[in-house]
Amino acid sequence: MLNKIIHNNKEKIVIGYFSSDFKDHAIGQLTVELLELHDKKKFEIIGFYNDNIEDHLTIRIKKSFSKFYNIKNLINSKVISLTKDLGVDIAIDLNGYTKNSRVDIFSERFCPLQISFLGYPGTSGIKNIDYLIADKNLIPEKNKKYYTEKIIYLPNCYQPSDSRRLVIDKKLTRSEFNIKNDQFVFCCFNTAHKINPKIFDCWANILRAIDNSVIWLLENNNISQKNLKQEAILRKIDPDRIVFCKRTSSQEHIKRYQLADLFLDTFPYGAHTTANEALFSGLPIITIIGESFQSRVCSSLLTTIGLKELITNSYEEYENLAINIAKNTQKLQSIKENLKINIKNSPLFKSKFYTENLEKAYINIYERHNNNLEPEHIYIN
C-alpha cells in the first residue's frame, strides 16, 4: 500500500539525506557538489547527520542544506517525528550497513518515498526502501531480481563526483615515499580488507613479470602490513617491493596518485571512491568485472569515462593486461592521454549534468507516488 503523505500543492519537493559521513569521508567527498548543485527552487534539501565530527568538508556540506540536524543522540522515534514535522517527501539513506548507520529507521515507513543510495554496495533487503540508485553497468537487467528495491537507472555512472575537490598545491616526489624514479609503480589504495589471497597471487605474478616494479599500498595497521609482507615472501617476492604510504588528508592523498603508473583493482570487492580518485588524477585502473554490485562499480566508472578496454573478465586476463601495459610504454602513455581528454569531456565528472539527471528521477518517483502508482523500475535518459 502506498503511504499517501505527499501534498500535491507543495511548492518544493522536500529531500532528506541521512548519513554519518558528512565529513572528510568517501561519502562526503562524493556527494558534496551534488548537494551544492541541487535546484533550490524545486527542492528543499535537509541534512540528517549521525556523527559529531566536524571538519572542513562538514562546513562545506552544511552550507548546501536549507536545514541541518545532528541526530546522533536522537532515538529513532524522535528522528521519525522530526522528519514528519519537516514534511520530508523523499528520505535517502547514504549509509546502508556501514559504521554509525541509522538504516534501521528505514525499516519503518516514516516517509512517503525511501531510497538507498551510494553508501552500501548492494540491496538493503528492507521492504520499506522503495528504490536503489544505480546504472545499467552496475545492475544489468538480468540482475534486477536480486534486489528488493526497484532500481533507478541513471544514464551514466551512478556515482556522483566533486569536480571542485581540493588538491594540495605542492609537488610530491617518489623519494618521499621510498620509491625510486626508475621503478614501475603499480598501486592499490583500496582498504586492506579488500585484498584477498587470489588477487595477491595476481599481484605477485605481475611483479614477477615486470622487473624493477613495486606495488604501492595504503597503510591500514601493523598486522596487515606484516601479513602482506609475509605473503610476498611465501610467493618468492622481495617484501621490499610492497611499499606502504601513510593515511593523510584527502587533498594530499589525491595528489599521490600522480606518482603511480597503473592502479590494480581488487576483486570481488573493488575500488569505488578510490577508482573515482584515481581517474580524476589521471591514473588508469585495471579491474575485473563480476556479477555483484561491489565488483562492478569500477567497471561502471571506466565505461563512463571511455576506458572499457581496462575492464577484464578473469584473473588471467587481468594479469596479462597489467603486464602488457607495463611492458609497453607507448600503450600506457596513449591510455593516459585518452584519460586526460575524457576527464574533461565524459559525463563522469560533470556534476551539474549528474545532478539534473538525479533530480529528474526524484521528480519522476514523486509524481508516480502522487498518481497513486506503486514503485517501479525507473530509467532516466
What are these regions (language model features)?
Residues 105, 206, 277, 301:
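Hydrophobic/aromatic ligand-binding patch that stacks against planar heteroaromatic rings
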